């Protein structure tokens, strides 16, 4: 289904400390932005097809989707203000 808002997907793996830290930042960002963005997480051990197609090589990775299509990976991992600025919505 095609979302009408930007969608961020964090690719993560259990036991990855940086992944857990990013999840906390993303939860705060979701709270601040509400319905202006949809933030999802994907465990690469359970769902490996999409990360493989995107050639995810390190974790955590944060992918931006618009209109249902992959747009790009975004930086600022762990810094919600940097992530927000790359979304151009807040």
Segment roles from a protein language model:
Residues 8-9, 39, 62:
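Hydrophobic beta-strand anchors of alpha/beta hydrolase catalytic cores
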Residues 16-19, 62:
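The canonical Cys-X-X-Cys-His
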Residues 28, 53-54:
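Chalcogenol-based redox active-site neighborhoods
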Residues 44-52:
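Structural microenvironment flanking redox-active thiols in thiol-disulfide oxidoreductases
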Residues 18-33:
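Typically the conserved alpha-helix immediately C-terminal to a functionally engaged Cys/Sec
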Residues 58, 63-90:
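Non-catalytic, surface beta->alpha helical segment in thiol-disulfide oxidoreductase systems
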């Amino acid at each position: 289904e095609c979302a009408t808002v930007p969608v961020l997907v964090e690719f993560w793996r259990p036991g990855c400390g940086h992944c857990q830290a990013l999840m906390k930042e993303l939860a705060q960002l979701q709270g601040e932005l509400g319905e202006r963005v949809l933030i999802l997480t994907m465990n690469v051990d359970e769902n490996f097809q999409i990360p493989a197609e995107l050639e995810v090589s390190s974790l955590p990775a944060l992918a931006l989707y618009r209109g249902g299509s992959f747009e790009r990976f975004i930086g600022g991992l762990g810094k919600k203000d940097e992530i927000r600025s790359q979304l151009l919505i807040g």
